[in-house]
Amino acid sequence: LGQISIDLYIRPDTIATVMNIFCLSEDPTEAAQMQCDKHVAKMCVEYSQLLATCFSLSRLAEDDCPRTQSGNPRKHFNPKHPSSIWTRLSKSNMRWLIRHATALFDEFELRFNKKHFCRDFLSWVILNIYDADVEEGKLTDFSIAISQDSLCRQDFRFDFASSVDKYRLYYIHDKKAFAKWNKGRPAPEWYQNMKVGA
């Protein structure tokens, strides 16, 4: 980590349903705590969807795997999306996302005073990680799933920024319309100061 990130090519058919891993810090817990209130609620679902792609459909259909809110077995949602591909590149990537998701579910409970429905699935993922169709390997640099028309890409720093700073720029330029921290966490210092990088 700490290297300049390389954007994965985002195919038009995968960006239609945007998924992301908001790596606002290399530390998975800190990255969760930095997310705005809206993302804390939304990303619990997306991270569960990303982690589901690590398991075969037959494993997801087994009786011990928690069902969706509608009572159906979990399916693979957008498995060719860059964030899904990154999650499955190595067990280290998967473990980073598990730690990040765990911290995000904690944030959800802190900010909204209730348990998120997907938390049971995350617990199942942790218990069954060795059933995942993911090879052991090192943590790779985060994928950047930010569309080409995003405002942050017009910032002269974007092309040379680390993955963390690219996502911070994304927050600063593209998420300010709804990025609020009103549920028990202050906005991160870098967001308050609109500053990224060293």
Regions found by a protein language model. Name each.
Residues 5-80, 84-198:
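Sequence termini and other peripheral, non-core segments
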